[in-house]
Amino acid sequence: MTREPRPEDRFSFGLWTVGWPGADPFGTASRPMLDPWQYAEKLAELGAWGITFHDNDVFPFDADETTKRQRVDRLKQAADSAGLVIEMVTTNTFTHPVFKDGGLTSNDRGVRRFGLRKILDAVDLAAEVGASTFVMWGGRELSLIHI
């Protein structure tokens, strides 16, 4: 028996769950990355209700403001056209090497300031795209203490 998702099921998917390029500690990426709007369109075809994403799922870590704006606008347009809700936005303060000691817990004041600015920018992004939830996941915060 196959069950098709319905909008009232409110299935949402993180773009990182489908956009992951297959890299791991033992090897480099094994499949190409698609643009986030391509994932959004496909998820809508499969019956998704909404999407969630990290800031850097939409634009590269080192993107300039023009590139960020273009990519956010394109994703928002794709989500709206497909009838998808952008349910949650979060920020990535753990992947880039600058955050090796955490975005908010680094001993380096400059890294903490940068991490906080990145988080606040992502809060604004969440509000802009209509997300009802913002998550600050501290993936590397105090990570050595937890080993």
Segments from the language model and where they lie:
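N-terminal pre-domain/capping segments
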Residues: 1-133
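Short, structured patches in soluble enzyme cores that scaffold and shape functional sites
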Residues: 138-140
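Conserved small/polar residues in nucleotide/adenosyl-binding loops
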Residues: 145-147
